[in-house]
């Protein structure tokens, strides 16, 4: 039995954009440029919602000068809850996904790094491969969703450097997905 997102009430209405790969003839890719995703959303009235996402460019994260445990970090649109029913344990997911330099952590990752300490409001630093630093304030702690399509430890909003990534569309029940 196929169990990924089996408890998601939106499961039957979520579609990933796939297109011909420019790198490999005859292959499909789920990479969509930021501009193409916006054009699809604006040109097809049947699209209820769009969710763009991509891994971040961070090499590692630090808290108070110490390197944190390895983490999968994803930047995404604020429409996450239109697609996936995440439950917030503490804080505001909306703030994490709409305010620059804010972030949400999974409950498991927060416990791994901070133990039982309430980490809402704490600041962590992202360090990319060039050594450039960017600070994020923790705005939310999310409960894990078993067998979720999305696998991550940290979430943040899409920033100005977003060029593209995976794009999901939410269509209404019964919509012609091939149109």
Language-model segments: what does each one mean?
Residues 6-7, 11, 39, 48-51, ...:
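Extracellular low-complexity Ser/Thr/Asn/Gly-rich intrinsically disordered segments
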Residues 38, 45, 136-140:
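Small-residue-enriched segments and motifs
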Residues 19-30, 38, 52-79, 85-102, ...:
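Short acidic/polar micro-motifs at solvent-exposed secondary-structure junctions
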Residues 77-90, 101-179:
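Mid-to-C-terminal secondary-structure elements
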Residues 15-18, 51, 166-169:
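Active-site-flanking beta-strand signature of metal-NTP-handling nucleotidyl enzymes
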Residues 45-49, 118:
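Glycine-centered tight turns that cap/initiate beta-strands
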Residues 1-18:
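Alpha-helical transmembrane segments
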């Amino acid at each position: 039995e196929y169990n990924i997102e089996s408890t998601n009430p939106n499961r039957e209405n979520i579609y990933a954009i796939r297109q011909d790969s420019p790198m490999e003839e005859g292959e499909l890719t789920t990479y969509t440029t930021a501009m193409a995703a916006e054009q699809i959303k604006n040109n097809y009235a049947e699209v209820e919602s769009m969710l763009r996402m991509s891994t971040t460019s961070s090499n590692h994260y630090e808290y108070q000068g110490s390197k944190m445990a390895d983490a999968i970090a994803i930047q995404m649109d604020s429409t996450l809850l239109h697609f996936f029913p995440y439950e917030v344990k503490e804080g505001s997911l909306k703030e994490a996904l709409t305010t620059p330099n804010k972030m949400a952590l999974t409950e498991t990752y927060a416990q791994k790094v901070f133990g039982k300490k309430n980490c809402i409001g704490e600041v962590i630093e992202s360090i990319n491969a060039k050594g450039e630093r960017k600070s994020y304030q923790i705005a939310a702690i999310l409960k894990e969703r078993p067998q979720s399509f999305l696998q991550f430890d940290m979430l943040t909003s899409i920033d100005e450097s977003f060029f593209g990534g995976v794009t999901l569309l939410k269509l209404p029940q019964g919509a012609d997905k091939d149109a």
